[in-house]
Amino acid sequence: LLWLSEQQGVFNFLRRNSLARRFASRFVAGETSETATAAALDLKRLGITTSLDLLGESVTRDAEAIGARDEYLRMLDRLAASGAEINVSVKLTQMGFDIDEALCVDNMRRILTKARELGGFVRLDMEGSAYTQRTLDFFERHLLAEFSKHTGVVIQSCLRRSADDVTRLIGMGARVRLCKGAYLESPEVAFPDKQDVDRQYVALMEQ
């Protein structure tokens, strides 16, 4: 589930555009972290697992990355206090990955330390294919050993490389979540045919 929080440009567009608002309502749990938490709690009562994701990526300033980090820290506390599942998904570019890797490491470690204290889980979202290897390297180098019980990574079944990635991650004992992928990629990198994406999704799931 997504929540909008302080992503003001996106927030204003969705508020003004009724078509965009109807489309987004399928995926956006709430306009604030409070409403997103309530949605997550409702789904937990139905036996449905959730992971909350703050809408936004590719920040360009340290302050934006730190602000997103602090919003995640507040969300983890809010989820714990509410009784909802303590599970969030984070994009590295939102944590300053393209600004300064040390900043990104610090932000992610703070989020994961909080999640570990609360018995929660942090999923590393996968972005476009230009970030796939960098994200996996970051996950292995900075997070997996210390936070293995509280973190995992996403793999996209649309990418041709994903079978090898899943095999390697399983060998490391990493927790993998599969998705089909929503980024526009070249046919050299990703399967252009949905049937191939679906077929690989099933094959990866069975590994």
Predicted regions span which residues?
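Positively charged, amphipathic and often flexible ligand-engagement surfaces
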Residues: 1-207
